[in-house]
């Protein structure tokens, strides 16, 4: 009888269906059965593999996790308070020092989510920070040549001119928009910033400053002061807003001490906090600024590279604001990742923020996974080498990557493959090419017997990525390149042949140059400059290209903000600074985050432990 109430549905009899209707119903049913049966082939073939990927259900993080983060004693373990309050003074006696110590202990042990107003207003002493810098932000170091050789000086000025041209084109045609479209000479907002504007402005701040483009920097600063508003109501990518906006603002503050950058960064960081309102504390990838929640219309999984690339920014937000909630959020992410089972020590790319279990069996050092590993080693360096947890996680992950993903092609090219449930895809993405620089960056702090090995490995991976550029007609690298069917370091599909002004390869050149002083990396960087000038420069800015194997490629009509923030900064990193004394080659760049922005090291944010 129910079927008779469906509009437009009239069965042949009160109790039956017409033959065509029966056929459609059976067709639907058979398709459903086929789909369910086919899904069985995607499941692990053994219970052992299932145990590797599907962690047993554990109690959802709640008060117990908050207590541990805040440094409170856990009741079930009956541990004494780390700093017990002093005994109460005898009646009638007044002990101001004891009362002061007790208040201090209460402040340390009270959960930060319910803290009362601080008695003393928080302030960050920028002048004290600046006085502790080991090297000047601009200019040369003591004992270094004021002027490099003429060829290097000309290269430096050329890259600065490229930055000026990219900025002036953006300012003329798209000022205030997120990115420039150079072919149509207009701006592009996109839908991943939740209504925020000016991504190129904020992403470019530190590059303009470091290149000593003073007029352009003042233009960017004025726009931030007057036009960068946070009263937006869209849905934004947590990852993109963090690395482009918050990262750019933090870098600008550390370089200049201008309060506008600090204040904007903190306020924007507060707007991202609802993304962490999940059962595990693993944030959703999309946050709704309108509803102040993290359950926007995105899918059910969180991506490793996204929730794993928040640590640096959020620790600095805590340091600059005095609000411990930022640090607590990212330390909770670390806690979840420490506890969960990892297949062969590898970190899959997708994690459920609800259950805390891995969702898929895909492991990649390229897209979806890349910056997680980068943030581990940089967290170690930025903590003035005190964050032992980050150090251990990084070297353990690197060992697993080398054991299960690293390959050498028949031509002798070293590459990092992708892993899908035990089966390797013999390809390497452009995003994975940052790993050469990352491994070089971490080689110094590896075990003594591994240091030379890691330096050689970094050089070999960087050479492979250079080959992906050298084997194209434009001398620019594809989005992904393969090692099969007799072809090596080339894209095999047109859909992977594009180049969107990405920085990862030149970042590795920069790190290897600063560490080894081998001029080959400077030469490779200059090859990229020439290729960008020939194939990506247009009348009104720089544009990505659709096919690197076409000597006259079509443009994609987009000047990415990271081209100014990362690619050009990494290129000038090879030639702008005078050649440093051997042994200090990468010190000035060791704190570059994923968007290649310089930050302070030795973050003084207190790190709560079980003993506090």
List the predicted regions and their residue ranges.
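Glycan-recognition and catalytic cores of secretory/periplasmic carbohydrate-active enzymes
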Residues: 2-12, 16-18, 24-25, 31-48, ...
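Cytosolic juxtamembrane regulatory segments of membrane proteins
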Residues: 51-63
């Amino acid at each position: 009888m129910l079927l008779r109430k469906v509009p437009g549905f009239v069965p042949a009899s009160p109790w039956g269906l017409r033959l065509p209707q029966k056929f459609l119903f059976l067709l639907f049913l058979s398709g459903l059965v086929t789909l369910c049966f086919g899904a069985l082939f995607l499941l692990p073939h053994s219970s052992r593999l299932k145990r590797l990927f599907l962690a047993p259900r554990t109690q959802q993080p709640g008060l117990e996790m908050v207590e541990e983060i805040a440094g409170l004693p856990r009741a079930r373990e009956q541990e004494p308070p780390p700093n017990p309050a002093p005994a109460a003074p005898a009646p009638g006696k007044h002990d101001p020092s004891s009362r002061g110590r007790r208040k201090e202990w209460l402040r340390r042990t009270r959960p930060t989510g319910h803290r009362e107003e601080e008695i003393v207003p928080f302030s960050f002493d920028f002048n004290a920070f600046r006085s502790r810098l080991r090297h000047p932000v601009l200019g040369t170091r003591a004992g270094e040549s004021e002027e490099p050789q003429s060829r290097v000086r000309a290269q430096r000025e050329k890259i600065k001119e490229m930055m000026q041209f990219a900025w002036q084109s953006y300012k003329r045609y798209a000022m205030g928009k997120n990115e420039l479209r150079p072919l149509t000479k207009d701006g592009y907002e996109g839908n991943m910033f939740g209504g925020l504007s000016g991504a190129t402005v904020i992403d470019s701040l530190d590059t303009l400053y470091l290149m000593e483009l003073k007029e352009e920097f003042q233009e960017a600063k004025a726009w931030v002061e007057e036009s960068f508003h946070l009263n937006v109501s869209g849905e934004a990518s947590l990852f993109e807003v963090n690395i482009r906006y918050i990262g750019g603002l933090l870098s600008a503050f550390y370089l200049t001490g201008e309060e506008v950058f600090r204040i904007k960064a903190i306020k924007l960081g507060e707007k991202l906090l609802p993304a962490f309102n999940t059962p595990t504390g693993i944030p959703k990838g999309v946050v709704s600024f309108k509803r102040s929640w993290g359950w926007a219309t995105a899918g059910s999984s969180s991506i490793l590279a996204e929730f794993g690339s928040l640590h640096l920014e959020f620790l600095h937000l805590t340091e600059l604001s005095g609000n411990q909630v930022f640090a607590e959020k990212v330390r909770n992410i670390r806690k979840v990742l420490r506890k969960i089972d990892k297949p062969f020590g590898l970190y899959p790319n997708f994690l459920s923020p609800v259950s805390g279990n891995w969702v898929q069996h895909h492991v990649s050092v390229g897209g979806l996974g890349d910056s997680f590993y980068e943030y581990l080693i940089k967290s170690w360096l930025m903590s003035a080498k005190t964050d032992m947890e980050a150090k251990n996680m990084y070297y353990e992950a690197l060992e697993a990557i080398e054991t299960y993903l690293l390959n050498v092609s028949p031509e002798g090219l070293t590459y990092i493959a992708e892993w899908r449930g035990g089966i390797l895809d013999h390809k390497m993405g452009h995003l994975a090419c940052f790993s050469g620089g990352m491994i070089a960056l971490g080689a110094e702090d590896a075990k003594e017997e591994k240091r030379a090995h890691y330096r050689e490995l970094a050089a070999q991976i960087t050479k492979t990525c250079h080959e992906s550029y050298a084997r194209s007609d434009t001398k620019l690298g594809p989005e992904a390149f393969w090692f099969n069917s007799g072809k090596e370091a080339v894209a095999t599909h047109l859909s992977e042949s594009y180049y969107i002004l990405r920085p990862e390869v030149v970042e590795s050149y920069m790190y290897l140059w600063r560490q080894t002083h081998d001029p080959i990396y400077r030469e490779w960087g200059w090859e990229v400059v020439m290729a960008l000038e020939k194939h990506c420069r247009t009348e009104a800015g720089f544009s990505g290209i659709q096919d690197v194997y076409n000597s006259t490629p079509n443009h994609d009509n987009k000047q990415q903000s990271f081209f100014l923030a990362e690619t050009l900064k990494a290129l000038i990193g090879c030639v702008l600074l005078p050649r440093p004394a051997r042994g200090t080659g990468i010190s000035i760049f060791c704190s570059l985050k994923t968007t290649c922005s310089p930050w302070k090291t030795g973050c003084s944010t207190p790190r709560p432990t079980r003993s506090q």
